[in-house]
Amino acid sequence: LASRYGMHSELMGIELLDSPIMSVRTGLFHTSNGIPSHYLRNFYRDAYEIVRLHMPETKMVVFSASGHPAAWKRFMSGSKYKNVCMDIHLYHYRDDMALDITTPRGLSSAIARNRRLIDEAASAGFPAIVGEWSGAAVFTNASITPEGCSAFERVFISSQMASFTKARGWFFQTWKTEKRIAAWDARVALGTLERAMLE
C-alpha cells in the first residue's frame, strides 16, 4: 500500500494493523488470549521502517491501541519516529464496560470512558484517532418506545462526538448498511444532527 499510494496527496496515512487482540495481564500469573505485546511492538517498529521508505513523514503512520492505550507509553518515542498516531476503537455495546445508556449515570460513564481512553493515548505520547465508533449501545429498559430509543441514540451519538474533541479525527463504523440500521449506518445515525455538530 505504501509503495502504491504513499505519495498520493489524498492519502492521510496508513494503519499498520487493524484491531489486533493483544494479550494483557489479568492477574499475577495469568494473561488473556491474544498476541503478546512485544510481538506487536516489534511488528509496528519494523512496519514503520518499511512504510517510511515509500511514504513521507507528513503522512501519518497509525497503529492500533488494541483496547489498551496506556500500555503503549514510551513506545516509538525516539526522534526517528515521526507523525505516529494511535487508533482507538470506542464501542459501548459488548464489552465489560458496556452500560445501559438510558440512565444519566450510564450515559455519563460511557462518555467519560471515551475521554479517558483518548487522554490515555495522549499520556502515552500519541495523538489519537477514533478509528471506529458507532451508536450501538445497551438498552436494558424494556419499556422504551421506538421514539424514545431514537432520542437516546441521538443524545448518545452527539455526546460521543463531543467527547472526541481531543482526538485528531474520527471514523464512524459504517457509512451504509443494507437495512439502514440506525446505530451502525452513518447516514441514519448522523443524519438528524445539525451540520455544525459534524464540523
PLM regions with names:
Residues 3-6, 10-13, 17-161:
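Extracellular glycoside hydrolase catalytic/binding regions
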Residues 145-199:
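Aromatic-rich peripheral "rim/lid" segments of glycoside hydrolase catalytic domains that contact
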